[in-house]
Amino acid sequence: MEKGMNVLHDFGIQSTHYLQVNYQDSQDWFILVSVIADLRNAFYVLFPIWFHLREAVGIKLLWVAVIGDWLNLVFKWILFGQRPYWWVMDTDYYSNASVPLIKQFPVTCETGPGSPSGHAMGTAGVYYVMVTSTLSMFRGKKKPTYRFRCLNVILWLGFWAVQLNVCLSRIYLAAHFPHQVVAGVLSGIAVAETFRHIQSIYNASLKKYFFITFFLLSFAIGFYLLLKGLGVDLLWTLEKARRWCERPEWVHIDTTPFASLLKNVGTLFGLGLALNSSMYRESCKGTLSKWFPFRLSCIVVSLILLHLFDSLKPPSQIELIFYVLSFCKSAAVPLASVSLIPYCLARVLGQPDKKSL
């Protein structure tokens, strides 16, 4: 088993080396792709846009992003995936040969296990939701037209172009091996496809959101404690990241498994609070919500305020405080974009004339 994995990892190292040597001019592009593919953009950019354009799509997008990333965490704890940037330095596979030179970048040194790729899984799930939802909106109940078929081809070509760029980016940056990004894409699509058949998320009560959040958090912590009790160190990757990362400042605590867990459950709990609040019912369920200028205003204000909010980084000196603040910050994102911002704008704009609806 280990010998087979070493061969697979060596193929990944050679792939990374090939990309870094032959596509040096694309370095900035691959870094940009990796930054854009971060799941944070699904929460801070894509969610407020889709929620105020098509509420059901926004809700499904957030559920897919959260549950997909939670499953990604569990998979990583089970699979114990290596990362190229530390494996190439840590392995004795190259004992009788020269070690391939692998460059590191500011976004390379993530601290969690590597399989499956979180960037690939998150992007695949979120973009799958957007593509399938867009196609369902334009198709209607009639027989597909020529224009619809063209749109179908264009959107799916765009989808796979995005996935290819994300996968190549993660390999180029030495953050993942090829088999890890492929596993991420397939897993993300599977999660998104599953949520196409789940209707209960659109009218879930606050109690249901609370219990699901509690289950996700307690299961992950319980699973961690169980494996730890069996002698398995699930934070083994943190030591490797700190040891083999080229620069200490490139190792960020917000990429640890528990940071990801708290962000996800915080986001889902915040969505539950927002959708079951009186501010949401007054602003997003009345006649004003049908007025396009109002919805557009909600999108613009949400994007601006969430961008400013995202720039506020919780202090990371004390891990417990960092995790608690990460949970609160994540919960505030859907709470602001779903209820607080629309409520305030509704008070400012007032009720529109019926002719303008």
UniProtKB/Swiss-Prot annotation:
Its recorded name reads Glucose-6-phosphatase catalytic subunit 1
At the top of the EC hierarchy, this enzyme's class is hydrolase
Q: What does this protein do?
A: Hydrolyzes glucose-6-phosphate to glucose in the endoplasmic reticulum. Forms with the glucose-6-phosphate transporter (SLC37A4/G6PT) the complex responsible for glucose production in the terminal step of glycogenolysis and gluconeogenesis. Hence, it is the key enzyme in homeostatic regulation of blood glucose levels.
Q: Where in the cell is it found?
A: Endoplasmic reticulum membrane
One BP annotation, GO: glucose homeostasis
Question: Does the keyword section mention Transmembrane?
Answer: yes
The record ties this protein, via Pfam families, to: PAP2
Gene expressing this chain: G6PC1
